[in-house]
Amino acid sequence: MLQALLDSKDFLALTLAHPEQFDSEFSFRLGDHTQVEVWDTGVIVFEPAQNEGKDVVLSCGVHGNETAPIELCNGLIKQLLQQKIIAKQRTLFLIGNPLAINNGTRIIDENMNRLFSGEHSNPPGLVNPERVRAKKLEAYIDRFYTAVADGRQRIHYDLHTAMRASKHEKFAIYPYRPGRAFSGEQIMFLAASGVDTVLFHHEPTTTFSYFSSERYGADAFTIELGKVYPMGQNDMTRFIATHEMFMRLITAKPLELDAFDADKVNLYQVCRVINKHFDDFEFTFATDVENFRSFPKGFVLAREGGQEIKVEHEFESVVFPNAKVPIGNRTVICLIPAVNADVR
């Protein structure tokens, strides 16, 4: 495996050739500047000999059909392995769900991004590939962040693409973080990366980014980088700004960020999450409605169990509507403009 990676510099290809696990860990050096450690399939760490005090996690492929972030991360890994760029921050790349990537599907058995913060081991337990992998990914995050002294900035960008078109092509979800202000610097980093819209979540979740935020105090986000396309069919010119800012972050080049300005970004607050309680749950709007479509107060969003679910605020925007989820799961997130967010 080591020689195959040294020859090809293609970590994604190696991962997909061994989607369940690698037989053993291995490591090697790049020149005199970087120690590279491969912990498992889809798990590679770059440890600079001299680093600038940030511990960066870039994860992708938690959903196997969300290919643009996978190609973006593999491109950065390849540049690092080719020594075209040199890491100056400790960096962990995670390719989340290799089995689903090979399968060309979002999941194998279950939505992995609902299985973190220990949810993977709640009943029925570790019964499918996503649950097993989620537990391993948590362990790799823990190993990476706790291998060095506290006090360093921890960052985790969990990269996705959405199943539908969006009024705002690229957007990020800022996990619930009670007692901690939202970072204006991070929001402006996202804006410089082409991600000009941020949703502030209002409650704990079992997503990957919430896990890193809550457990390790990381500046963590779920980042949606556009729409789902098959591998190799993404227009990577749409990610030039994202690639550039991630490269600057990893190599400790000046980020040259603007000061936080709420007028330069679109900020939303999650006002509620609507879960499914009956099999007959259905939305009243078209199945292909774009993310961030806005509806007025009193509009009937959905019906289930003989009840109507209506818009409660003057206007509410919807993201991730999906009526075809199991009972108990989220069908849609409803948003209102964020006017009093604690951003510093």
Swiss-Prot record:
The keyword Hydrolase applies. Zn(2+) binds at residues 63, 66, 160. Binds 1 zinc ion per subunit. This is Succinylglutamate desuccinylase. Its cofactor is Zn(2+). Belongs to the AspA/AstE family. Succinylglutamate desuccinylase subfamily. Pfam families: AstE_AspA_cat, AstE_AspA_hybrid. It catalyses: N-succinyl-L-glutamate + H2O = L-glutamate + succinate. It comes from the Bacteria. Keywords: Arginine metabolism, Hydrolase, Metal-binding, Zinc. The active site is at residue 224. Its EC number is 3.5.1.96.
